[in-house]
C-alpha cells in the first residue's frame, strides 16, 4: 500500500485552493460573448480548440496531489452543471472559486466553518427561489433562437437552426448533433425513436469522452424474454460477426453469463455489440417492442408465436442507419421500416387513443404515437477543418442543452445580471448567528463575480460596471458585453435559462462548502524517482532504457 501524505487545517485548504485557482484561471477566460479560446493538446491528432468551460476543466490534471484534489473538486462543479443543465459550467467554476476563497479567509480568521456553510446554504436557497419567481416562460421560435445564440457564444446561425429543429419535432422531440461531411450546417429530420433505457454495461461504450455507445448501420435483435444464456443465440451471433456489422440487443433483460459473455466479446473486438432493456412494462413493453420492430423492419422474437432464438436468422433482425445509447436513453435513427407499415401502425394507435377511456392509457398511447411518428431532427455541423467542426459541434451541443433547459424552467436576464441583482435581496436577509451572517455575506460578494469576469473578458473594468448596475432598481438592467452598452437585457434578447443559472449556483456552493469544511486531507505521497544506474560507457544517461 502506498504511503500517505497528510495535511491539516489552513495548510491543507491553502494548497487545495492553489489547485482551484489554476483550474479556474484556465476556465474563466471562456466566459461571455468575448471570452477567448483555449487550446488543448490531445494524446493523438490535432490540438482541440474550445470555448466550452467543462471541456477545459476535464482536460486538467495537476502533478501535485493536494493541488490536484482542489482542482478535481472544482471540476466536479462544472461537470455536474453540464450534466444537469447542459451549460453554465464556467459560471459554476467562477462562483465556486469565489465562494471557496472568501470562505477560507473567514475560517482562517476563526469563524466556524459549519456555521459559514449554513449561512451560505440559506443564501443560496433564497437566491434559487428568487430565480424561479423571476423566470419567464418562452414560447416563440424567436425566443428559443435567442437562447441558442447566447449559449453558443453569439453564433446566430446555431440559435436559428436549433429553433428550426424544435419547430420540426416539437420542444420535447429528439434532436441529435453529428458532424457533416461538407461545409454546410443543416437540419435534417429522419425517422427515429428514443426510449428511456440506457446501456446495461458501461463496457459497451464506444465514445468514452461522451460516455455513449454509437453503432453505425447495426442489426437489431428484439427478444421478448430475459437473456441469461447465449447458447441458443450462437448461430445468429456468428452470422452477425461474419457480416462485420454491429448488433443491438433489446430484451426484457440481459443478465449473468449472457451479459458477461457479450462484454468479453465486445472488449476483445470480436463482436461490436450493445444491450439495453426493452422500454415499458407488461403488455405496454410488448407493444413498444412491436413498434420498434416495425420501425426497423425486424421481428419481435416471442415464444407466443412459437419462435425460438436458435431458429432466428439474420432476416429476422431489424436494421437502422445509426443507434446512440447513453447511460439513460437509446436513440434509433432512420430505421429501415417501410413507410406503409409505419403509417398503418400510427393509424392503429390513433384508433386506440380514440377508444380508450383511461387518461393514463391515453397519455401512454400518445407517447408511443409521438415516438413512432415524430421523427428525429439531426443537426449536421460542417466546417473547413476537422478542428473547426469539432469546436463548433461542442458549441451546438451546449446550446441545444441550454435551450432545452430554457424550455423546461423559463429564462431570466442573462450576462450575470440576474445573479448580481438577486444578491441585493440577500442584504435584507439577517440571522442572529454572526458566523452564519458571514456565510450570507460570502454569497453576496461571490454573486458579483460572473458579471465582473464577463466584463473583464470584454476588456472593461468589472468593478466599475458592477457598481453602475447596482445603482439601478430595474432587475433587467445590464451590460451587453458584445456591444459594450448598458441595456434592458430581456428586451435586447440577452437571456439565460433559469435552470442553468440556478444549477451553476447550487453546484458551486456545494463544492465550496466541501472545501471550507475540510480539516484534514490525505493523498498518496509522491514517489521519489530513483536515480538511473550509471554505465561504464559515455552513454550513462541511457541506463534506464529497457528494450
UniProtKB/Swiss-Prot annotation:
Residues 528-547 are annotated as: Disordered. One of its GO terms (biological process) is protein refolding. Transmembrane segments: none annotated. Residues 537-547 have a biased composition (Gly residues). GO terms for molecular function: ATP binding; ATP-dependent protein folding chaperone; isomerase activity; unfolded protein binding. SUPFAM superfamilies: GroEL apical domain-like, GroEL equatorial domain-like, GroEL-intermediate domain like. Its main location: cytoplasm. Keywords: ATP-binding, Chaperone, Cytoplasm, Isomerase, Nucleotide-binding. CDD domains: GroEL. Forms a cylinder of 14 subunits composed of two heptameric rings stacked back-to-back. Interacts with the co-chaperonin GroES. Together with its co-chaperonin GroES, plays an essential role in assisting protein folding. The GroEL-GroES system forms a nano-cage that allows encapsulation of the non-native substrate proteins and provides a physical environment optimized to promote and accelerate protein folding. Belongs to the chaperonin (HSP60) family. This is Chaperonin GroEL. The gene is groEL.
